Amino acid sequence: MKIAVLGAAGGIGQALALLLKLDLPANSILSLYDLAPVTPGVAKDLSHIPTSVKVEGFAGTDPTAAIEGADVILISAGVARKPGMDRSDLFNINAGIIKNLVAKVAEVAPEACIGIITNPVNTTVAIAAEVLKAAGVYNKNKLFGITTLDVIRAEEFVAELKGLPSEDVRVNVIGGHSGTTILPVLSQIQGVSFTDQEVIDLTSRIQNAGTEVVEAKAGGGSATLSMACAASRFAIQLVHALSGKQGIIQNAYVDGGNPASPFFTQPLLLGKNGIDKVLPYGELSSFEETKKEEMLSVLHADIEMGIDFVSKTLAAEVS
């Protein structure tokens, strides 16, 4: 199995590459790509770690060598948030990066599963889908917005509040991957109860956790390490599912036929071809149902922004 990381020299990319080198199944190939000339050196550094995962690194403007034959392609390339920015502020730069990289994936590795990490995920996944459609290779079962960071934050914050081991807490997080579109379904957590105020405070903290990190780093970066952990967790499970392991369920932001929104984060049963089945996200409390309805206009606008971007740029290229 070959796994490619595009944006591998960045804060998320390097940490993600390390985790994948440690945790991918034996004899996997880990292929790293970035514009930065340091990328082959990152691969060389990782290659000294004693695991049976082969690492290769590529730098420059053409990612072809990195993605040829890849089964899974993880895209973290782009600029990171700085204080005062939200994920939508990243759009103008990151939209073009995603469009160009996904266009190359469509050309070189059209059968690969693609995991989008680059923010704003609500929009960049829609961009990726439109690019793949334009190339005639779109498979909705193989395109994922990686939102696992919202899940691991929710699980950690609940465990912290209730004095529980983090590994014993499971939280279903639905919706999108920014601000109010992130909806932790706290009412479904087994064996844990919350006051109304705890639900309000926890929901807000989970939704704004990215800002919490950006501000704490005081201009020195965003949530690179926890995002790398989350992306690795998702990618490893996806690799296991592609290899035939059954019963693997992960949440991700996908084109899953949800009547609420063209793209929506919800539980997925993964299989040998990507998404095997989109699972229902279950019953919501009245608070959660209200929050879901309130988020939809934001989510729809984020998606339309991505669709419009691709439509306009493709039209400009033709003219």
Swiss-Prot record:
It catalyses: (S)-malate + NAD(+) = oxaloacetate + NADH + H(+). Substrate binds at residues 81, 87, 119, 153. Disulfide bonds: none annotated. It holds the Pfam family Ldh_1_C. NAD(+) binds at residues 7-13, 34, 94, 117-119, 227. GO terms for cellular component: cytoplasm. SUPFAM superfamilies: LDH C-terminal domain-like, NAD(P)-binding Rossmann-fold domains. The active site is at 177 (proton acceptor). It is an enzyme of class 1 (oxidoreductase). HAMAP family: Malate_dehydrog_1. Belongs to the LDH/MDH superfamily. MDH type 1 family. Homodimer. This is Malate dehydrogenase. It comes from Psychromonas ingrahamii (strain DSM 17664 / CCUG 51855 / 37). The lineage of its organism: Bacteria, Pseudomonadati, Pseudomonadota, Gammaproteobacteria, Alteromonadales.
